[in-house]
């Protein structure tokens, strides 16, 4: 699963997800893409599950680009721990995804195959997404 090799600080504040994604909102690599329409934290496990669903469907054809990276640590306290005594330890990593963010790109396959692969990937994600093509993007 994806995670940073090293970070400057072990723990981060939660932050807020306001507004639309301005960076990472255009098709850069492939012909087809999966675009987020809701804000959410996407875990590294969810990204990996979506990637596996797509690669299993398209088999050996096509190329997939993952456009989100989980660089935010999520901390958790041990179960049944009293309040106080500091912040919990980092448990997993998430990618902060805002509406408009392109999460996956795909090329080298026909549009019906790409559409179905993206649908399978979208089922693994906790947010609503939409399928876009390079032609639709500039309309």
Swiss-Prot record:
It comes from the Bacteria. Gene3D superfamilies: Ribosomal protein L10e/L16. One of its GO terms (biological process) is translation. The keyword rRNA-binding applies. GO terms for molecular function: rRNA binding; structural constituent of ribosome; tRNA binding. Belongs to the universal ribosomal protein uL16 family. This is Large ribosomal subunit protein uL16. The gene is rplP.
């Amino acid at each position: 699963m994806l995670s940073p090799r090293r970070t400057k600080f072990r723990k981060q504040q939660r932050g807020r997800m306001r507004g639309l994604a301005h960076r990472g909102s255009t098709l850069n690599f492939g012909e087809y893409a999966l675009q987020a329409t809701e804000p959410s934290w996407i875990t590294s496990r969810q990204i990996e599950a979506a990637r596996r669903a797509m690669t299993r469907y398209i088999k050996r054809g096509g190329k997939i680009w993952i456009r989100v990276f989980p660089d935010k640590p999520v901390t958790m306290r041990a179960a049944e721990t009293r309040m106080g005594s500091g912040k919990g330890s980092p448990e997993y990593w998430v990618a902060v995804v805002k509406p408009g963010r392109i999460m996956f790109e795909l090329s080298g396959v026909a549009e019906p195959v790409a559409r179905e692969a993206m649908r399978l990937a979208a089922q693994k994600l906790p947010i609503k997404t939409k399928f876009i093509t390079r032609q639709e993007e500039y309309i």
